[in-house]
Regions:
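Mature, Sec-exported extracytoplasmic domains of Gram-positive
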Residues: 1-206
Length: 206
């Protein structure tokens, strides 16, 4: 089928149990109608590095008055990868992430104070470190939504200088859904090219 958002979904014939012991995904989702250059750039710059797995920045409702809703310990590794262009290596921090290092990165991308981060995140006050736990079979169950890819489909410049990005969570596995959820992410860009996330709203109850 061809979707209204410009995706073509088809399904391959794949073996099924009992021929195989594991389910084989034959679903394929291909974008036919291209995004604009600006939409592609915004997708890569602001949302693709975050995704919907291991953090809740893009998949929960929050704003500058409700910063306590974010999972700061989960968000850290994704912001780290965005800033440094390399994966966060937990082996470098066997005893937790040092306070100053954790807080400075979070405050670079989110409008929170060090005091708020200590209150909202899991903070080891004795050792002055923040806890980080790798996702695994004991603390995470993969979902189709979690593996979805965020894609900016609309960009709106607001009068207050912020920008609202309309984002679709595109799932190309099994369910082949070009918008598992749609949400509006508000960001503010600085003259030097840096930016902060200011809020997220799930549209139509997800």
């Amino acid at each position: 089928k061809y979707t209204d958002k410009g995706w073509f979904c088809y399904e391959l014939c794949v073996p099924e149990p009992p021929e195989v012991t594991e389910i084989v995904d034959g679903s394929c989702l291909v974008r036919i109608k291209p995004l604009s250059k600006e939409q592609r750039e915004m997708s890569e710059r602001c949302v693709q590095g975050l995704g919907y797995q291991g953090n809740n920045l893009l998949c929960s409702n929050w704003d500058t008055d409700h910063m306590e809703k974010l999972d700061y310990n989960g968000i850290y590794e994704y912001l780290y990868a965005m800033k440094h262009q390399k994966a966060f290596d937990a082996e470098d921090y066997p005893n937790g992430i040092p306070k100053e290092e954790f807080e400075s990165l979070i405050m670079e991308y989110l409008p929170v104070t060090a005091e708020q981060i200590q209150e909202y995140a899991v903070f080891d006050e004795k050792n002055q470190t923040y806890v980080w736990v790798r996702l695994g079979c004991l603390n995470y169950a993969p979902t189709f939504f979690g593996t979805s890819l965020p894609e900016v489909i609309d960009i709106k410049e607001n009068e207050d200088g912020t920008v609202t990005l309309t984002v679709d969570a595109v799932c190309d596995m099994v369910i082949c859904d070009d918008a598992v959820i749609t949400h509006e992410l508000t960001v503010k860009f600085a003259d030097d090219g840096s930016f902060q996330y200011l809020g997220n709203e799930i549209l139509d109850d997800g």
